[in-house]
Amino acid sequence: MELKLLQDNGQIGAGVAASAEVFGRDYNEALVHQIVVAYQANARSGNRKQKDREEVKHTTKKPWRQKGTGRARAGMSSSPLWRGGGRIFPNSPEENFSQKVNKKMFRAGMRSIYSQLAREGRINVVDGFAVDAPKTKLLADKFKAMGLDSVLIITDNLDENLYLASRNLPNVAVVEPRHADPLSLVHYKKVLVTKAAVAQIEELLK
């Protein structure tokens, strides 16, 4: 199969040969959903904290005697049943949100994403992608000439000027093939891959 070549003026050029094993697979929506959710979960860190009955600052004195008042028995005001008491199952920063995804499943999911991008015309090959200086304006003007506004660039050799120029653009990311993740692939409207990076992707996902 072939991936379309995108020229600097935004025009589509000749096709570039690509492996059907990576870019020609059927779309598995359930698997893609699973690896995207797992990626988000594994990037999550615990930042919630609630107190249980041991941590709430309350007196441990018994509110009233056990029997004879007609009220329900109570041990202390830090009980989760009381207003201002501790939580029964409090959230903690030590919570583990990670989800395990087997390597075989992950590679199959990534192949499914790349294949769907190719079918939708959202992935194109470029001869190379570089800027002369680490200037955001140079890169922004280049994208404007190509008619792009939301771009993930997958390059075989991460150019420092390109990386620095892209950091201040909100809808642009630059990564190497081994760092391409499922969330970024489905998030950006257009994915640009250098010719050498296509071979690296095929090697990673074979």
Curated annotation (Swiss-Prot):
SUPFAM superfamilies to which the protein is assigned, alphabetical: Ribosomal protein L4
SS bonds (residue pairs): none
Listed Basic and acidic residues bias regions: 49-58
Top-rank taxon, per record: Bacteria
A GO MF label: structural constituent of ribosome
GO CC, any one term: ribosome
Region feature Disordered, mapped onto this chain: 43-78
Protein name (record): Large ribosomal subunit protein uL4
Species: Cupriavidus metallidurans (strain ATCC 43123 / DSM 2839 / NBRC 102507 / CH34) (Ralstonia metallidurans)
The organism's taxonomic lineage, starting at the top: Bacteria, Pseudomonadati, Pseudomonadota, Betaproteobacteria, Burkholderiales
